[in-house]
């Protein structure tokens, strides 16, 4: 199983980018989120993302999804839930360009699982990113914050 990407909007611009965690940051973190009935978007995160989007930042979701590797839900169930998140954000005025996710279990030792930088490297191969002007937003300093530190980027923690 490889790092997986879902690209919603392609562009050729070099843009500052917000790399944002999904579960616990954009939406309520439920155990291995994959049911649309469980989807609850955090208004404060929407406001933060709209702020950066208004300043010309691209929005890209980066998320660990070990529930796939553990067999708790399928790739199709993940995609359906993630599309629900992205569509809800779009309804609220936030355009997500792509989602990059690691489907592996933590014990698999892959290079894409956050706080490793594999997901970001994939995004950098698909998009022109002003990495020096970019940042990471997430709810966990040990994962999202460490990802930011590994990249030398600022980190904005959100808590709900």
From Swiss-Prot:
Subcellular location: Cytoplasm
Enzyme class: hydrolase
Transmembrane segments: none
GO cellular component terms listed in the entry, alphabetical order: cytoplasm
Residues reported in the UniProt entry to bind Zn(2+): 102, 104, 110, 112
Site label Stabilizes the phosphoryl group, positions: 63, 114
Pfam families: PNK3P (PF08645)
Site feature location: Contributes to substrate recognition: 113
Superkingdom to which the source organism belongs: Archaea
Cofactor: Mg(2+); Zn(2+)
UniProt KW tRNA processing keyword: no
GO biological process: carbohydrate metabolic process
NCBIfam families recorded: HAD-SF-IIIA, Histidinol-ppas
Protein name: Probable D-glycero-D-manno-heptose-1,7-bisphosphate 7-phosphatase
Gene encoding the protein: gmhB
